[in-house]
């Protein structure tokens, strides 16, 4: 992808990178400014572990970034958050550990220009609104490698940011994608694809909603 995107390509580690102690893209925090928004990229990987964490340093950095920018902020990390309404409270939770997820929710609840949090890891499409985070959306995006073979595109507008779901198109890649659809006794397809509302949607600028409510 480097040949296509050049210095616009930003990497964040996942759990498979951390298993072998790779330092590739080992950047705890990255700030990327684009027209109309700021991208806050967090390394949630834990050395040799499948699940993720967010440090106090990263939380403080995110809060400071949100306090000094007047744009919408999209937050990216590999691991998805723990959902207090759905997930058992365990430190070996598959995504970001519960206490760290709660620290992230607290920043979202205070900083309304944090528009949403975007993750991979689960290889599925899912969107959750977390009450403890002020109702902000926490999103998981399916992977390129397996069904449905997808990437997410983000379009920045005044008043919100739109997620557009895009599938791979090369015939050979599609053939492989259809093979992986049958994993887990045929249940993987429905798990990974998610609902239409999990794939294409608008994340509203939460500052506008707060102003109306006030």
For each of these PLM feature ranges, what is it?
Residues 1-28, 100:
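Core catalytic region of metal-dependent phosphoesterases/phosphodiesterases
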Residues 15-18, 45, 80, 121-125, ...:
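Catalytic metal-binding/acid-base residues of hydrolase active sites
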Residues 28-35, 128-132:
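Short acidic-hydrophobic surface loop/beta-edge motif
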Residues 31, 39-41, 151-153:
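Conserved hydrophobic/aromatic beta-strand scaffold that supports enzyme active sites
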Residues 36-46, 74-76, 137-142, 164-168:
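Active-site-proximal beta-strand elements of phosphoester/diester hydrolases
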Residues 40, 49-137, 187-211:
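His/acidic metal-ligating clusters that form di-metal
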Residues 113, 120-172:
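Active-site/pore-lining binding-face segments in mid-to-C-terminal subdomains
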Residues 157-214:
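A short C-terminal boundary segment appended to hydrolase-like catalytic domains
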């Amino acid at each position: 992808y480097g040949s296509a995107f050049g210095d616009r390509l930003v990497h964040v580690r996942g759990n498979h990178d951390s298993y072998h102690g790779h330092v590739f893209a080992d950047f705890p925090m990255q700030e990327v400014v684009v027209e109309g928004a700021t991208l806050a990229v967090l390394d949630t990987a834990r050395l040799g572990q499948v699940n993720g964490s967010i440090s106090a340093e990263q939380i403080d950095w995110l809060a400071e970034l949100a306090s000094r920018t007047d744009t919408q902020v999209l937050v990216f990390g590999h691991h998805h958050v723990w959902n207090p309404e759905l997930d058992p409270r365990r430190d070996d939770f598959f995504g970001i550990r519960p206490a760290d997820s709660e620290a992230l929710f607290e920043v979202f609840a205070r900083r309304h220009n944090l528009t949403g949090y975007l993750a991979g890891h689960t290889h599925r499409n899912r969107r959750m609104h977390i009450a403890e985070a002020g109702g902000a959306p926490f999103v998981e995006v399916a992977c390129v490698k397996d069904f449905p073979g997808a990437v997410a595109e983000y379009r920045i507008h005044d008043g919100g940011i739109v997620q557009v779901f895009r599938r791979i198109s090369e015939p050979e890649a599609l053939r492989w994608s259809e093979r992986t659809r049958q994993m887990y006794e045929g249940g993987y397809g429905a798990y990974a694809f998610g609902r239409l509302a999990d794939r294409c949607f608008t994340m509203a600028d939460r500052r506008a909603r707060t102003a109306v409510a006030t």
